[in-house]
Structure formats: C-alpha cells, structure tokens
Amino acid sequence: MKANGGREEKEVFAAYIAKNRLKRSGQREVILDTFLRQQRHLSVDDLHQLVQKRRPDIGRTTVYRTLKLLQAAGLAQELALDGQSRFEREYKRAHHDHFICKSCGEILEFSNPEIERIQDEIAAGIGFVIEGHRHQIFGLCRRCAARPPRDEARR
C-alpha cells in the first residue's frame, strides 16, 4: 500500500460520492479502508469476510455495491477469473497482466514491455487501434506445479 495510507484514494472516493450526490456512510468508509489495505485480488466474499472482522453489521450486498462504486470512481478494477469476479486496486497503477493458477487460484501480476511492444506492432500491422487490454495466462503456479499429480500421489 502507498505510504499515505490510501489518503488520495479516499479523497477521490469522497469527491465521487459528493459529485453523484450519494450518501457518505461509515460502512462505505470501512469497506474502502479494508479494500485499500489489501495487496491481493479480492472476491466480494473475501472482502466481506475481512470487513466483518471490523463491522459485523455490514452485509455482503453493501460490500458488493461499494465495490461497484469504487469501480465507477476509478479506484478498483473488476477481473473475471475462472467464472468469479475479483477486484484489485486500480488508481494510478501501472498496466500489468496476470498469471492465474488453475489449481489453487493464486494470481501473480507481471509487466513486460516486450509483450506490450509486440502487441502494439501486431495491432499497427492490421490497422487496429488498441484502447486497452487484459492479458491473462492460465497454468500452474510454482507450488502447484511441484506437487505430484493426484494419480501418482495415491500410489
């Protein structure tokens, strides 16, 4: 997390709430603060469980709706991974792509200028103007790849 404790993101969210004439609430602030403290990709249920430790009265629907507001405010990005939505911090983050483990669900971020250059080159060659992309590579993380296959484990 940034050294300012997410202060700038909190200001952006407060401005978004005011601009859209939405209600400021303690529940939304707890959800935002909890989200900003995380360094991983969270499902609604993941975030709800973390929020429940601080405020058991906050429901899953409130967490979901607040995540959608964070997304609309440019603070969170929703990723569809293996049929489940996960959210990550987006505000002022450099572009990156994802390796996703199909066994344990671990998500590893990476950035590679060469991949970006090749994509741009291919797009230019066919006259395509890239406005954005999401690159997700599915496979096995180091830990899962090192495990023996289940068939061999039973022998």
Where are these regions (language model features)?
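Short, leucine-enriched amphipathic alpha-helices that occur as contiguous helical runs
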Residues: 10, 27-28
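A short acidic, leucine-rich amphipathic alpha-helix
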Residues: 46-52, 63
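Short capping segments at the starts of secondary-structure elements
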Residues: 26, 37-43
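Non-DNA-binding regulatory cores of transcription-related proteins
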Residues: 72-155
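Short, Lys/Arg-enriched N-terminal segment that forms or immediately precedes the first helix
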Residues: 9-21
